[in-house]
A protein has these predicted regions:
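Long lumenal/extracellular ectodomains of secretory and single-pass membrane proteins
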Residues: 1-106, 116-192
Length: 192
């Protein structure tokens, strides 16, 4: 990069954090080749590193930099799956007015991350942070659309964990959820 040899950069070998930081420079100086690489990365045909990134890293760029682009989308899709194979976990996401910065990005990022990986009746579900917690079905095709959706969910100034457990059980009973698909954890993400 410092020598201006953009055509020699092997994009699948660029670390996740470097890709996130220099994505605009790659596009500016090597647009055609970089866009071809990104198209393949979005389709899963080419590796784009994301192993050193956390969900909040990508969500922060979208929330505060309004910088959603194909690099962030491809990296989101290739984030490592840290969730055990047979584990459902429900995130209770606080998106209240007191949440900002990294706490808000963490809450939204984990809500989306776990919702996408849950199976069965809990797939694409997260829970609101409220006195009367409710399940919310994640909507949107892109990371940007999902972030905007989670950001607009209803919230309260507190949460009732007993009511959250009851909602999990009600959903299980309503959908005849087998024991192996029951959530193994409720993850409360809040600045309280």
């Amino acid at each position: 990069m410092s020598e201006g040899k953009w055509e020699e950069i092997v994009y699948p070998e660029v670390s996740g954090r470097a890709m996130m930081i220099y994505r605009n420079a790659f596009r500016k100086h090597d647009e055609k080749r970089f866009n071809q690489y990104l198209a393949k990365a979005l389709d899963g045909k080419e590796k784009i590193h994301a192993e050193t990134l956390y969900p909040y890293d990508l969500v922060e760029k979208v929330l505060y930099g309004r910088q959603w682009n194909q690099v962030l989308e491809a990296q989101w899709r290739q984030l490592p799956d840290y969730v055990a194979q047979e584990t459902n976990a429900i995130v209770i996401a606080d998106v209240s007015g007191s949440m900002s910065g990294r706490p808000l990005a963490t809450s939204i990022g984990l809500a989306i991350y776990f919702a996408e990986r849950n199976r069965g009746a809990y797939h694409n579900l997260f829970m609101t942070f409220s006195q009367k917690p409710e399940f919310v079905s994640l909507r949107g095709e892109t990371l940007l659309q999902k972030i905007k959706y989670v950001e607009r969910t209803e919230w309260g100034m507190n949460t009732n964990l007993q009511a959250a457990f009851e909602r999990v059980l009600e959903t299980a009973m309503d959908h005849d959820v087998p024991p192996e698909e029951m959530p193994k954890a409720l993850i409360v993400v809040s600045d309280m």
